[in-house]
């Protein structure tokens, strides 16, 4: 990298969502020997609008499903849901496992990062939202009002394919579900507000994006639509990583077949994703543990 390019690169990294010198204070500092009982939350049902409550239930359900299908990463990563008709969205408290998440545990923030509501935690658990989560999710919700859900994962397969130079290959029918796959180059931990503009520009009108050397991003007009994209992208990445690890030459369909399949999978050709699948996913979550609705 030339000195001029280096100066330009350094100059643009100037305004983090949390100043780097204060980054430690942005995360809860916990006593490691403390006994932490199971988390319980006072229900917000009837205390928020019906639209917000539905968004909370669906978002919490998505967390449980991401955990169920093995796409989570301990307490990290994030799923957000926009509150319909508002410039506000829901984020997870950093420190909770995905299978602990419930409708009344989600933090409500506005597009500027102001906390509008947060749950009460036992003494010693000052869980807040992840600054990197705010940067990534506010970028999409600010620029794309039609997007109501954003899902970011660090799945093993997603990170692997995001690090392949060729990215996601059109090698399976599942991969061909995505006519457009966006890519965003890695810039370090996503705490710089300036990265939001570049992230949204790279996303364009795609439903999914591979964050180079990082993970995956899926967006949708509903939680069900975003989850469907996240799940399908994960399946496509797993298949590709497994196939490439075998060392065999990968057979790709012809360009004609790729375009034909892309067309068949367009929402305008058939239906928006999530309409058929999401009720079934909700029923699955209910069978596993309906406490996400609390």
Regions found by a protein language model. Give the residues of each.
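A short glycine-/small-residue-rich loop at the edge of a beta-strand within enzyme catalytic domains
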Residues: 131, 186-190, 194, 217-224, ...
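Short gly/pro-enriched beta-turn/loop segments at secondary-structure junctions
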Residues: 145-146, 176-179, 202-206, 210-213
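A general structural signal for well-ordered alpha-helical packing
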Residues: 137, 196-200, 223, 227-230
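A conserved C-terminal secondary-structure "cap"
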Residues: 5-59, 207-210, 215-294
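Short, intrinsically disordered, mixed-charge
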Residues: 142-145, 166, 201-204, 232-235
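Class I SAM-dependent methyltransferase SAM-binding "motif I" and its flanking Rossmann-like core
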Residues: 153-200
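Divalent metal-coordination and catalytic microenvironments
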Residues: 81, 140, 154, 199, ...
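An anion-binding catalytic pocket shared by soluble metabolic enzymes
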Residues: 49, 56-151, 158-169, 174
């Amino acid at each position: 990298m030339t000195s001029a390019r280096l100066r330009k690169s350094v100059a643009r990294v100037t305004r983090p969502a949390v100043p780097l010198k204060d980054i430690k204070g942005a995360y809860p500092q916990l006593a490691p020997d403390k006994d932490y009982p199971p988390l319980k939350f006072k229900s917000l049902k009837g205390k928020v609008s019906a639209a917000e409550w539905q968004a909370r239930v669906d978002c919490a359900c998505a967390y449980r499903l991401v955990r169920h299908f093995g796409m989570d990463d301990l307490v990290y990563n994030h799923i957000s849901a926009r509150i319909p008709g508002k410039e506000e969205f829901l984020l997870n408290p950093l420190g909770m496992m995905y299978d602990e998440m419930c409708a009344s545990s989600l933090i409500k923030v506005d597009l500027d990062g102001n906390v509008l509501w947060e749950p009460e935690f036992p003494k010693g658990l000052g869980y807040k939202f992840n600054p990197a989560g705010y940067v990534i999710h506010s970028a999409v919700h600010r620029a794309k009002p039609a997007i109501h859900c954003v899902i970011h994962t660090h799945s093993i397969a997603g990170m692997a394919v995001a690090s392949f130079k060729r990215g996601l290959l059109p090698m399976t029918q599942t991969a061909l579900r995505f006519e457009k796959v966006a890519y965003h180059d890695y810039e370090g931990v996503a705490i710089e507000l300036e990265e939001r503009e570049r992230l949204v520009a790279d996303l364009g009108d795609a439903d999914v994006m591979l964050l180079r050397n990082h993970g995956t991003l899926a967006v949708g007009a509903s939680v069900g639509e975003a989850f469907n994209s996240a799940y399908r992208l994960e399946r496509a990445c797993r298949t590709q990583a497994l196939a490439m690890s075998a060392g065999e030459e990968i057979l790709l369909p012809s360009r004609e077949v790729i375009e034909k399949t892309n067309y068949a999978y367009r929402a305008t050709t058939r239906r928006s994703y999530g309409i058929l699948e999401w009720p079934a996913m909700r029923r699955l979550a209910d069978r596993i543990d309906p406490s996400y609705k609390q």
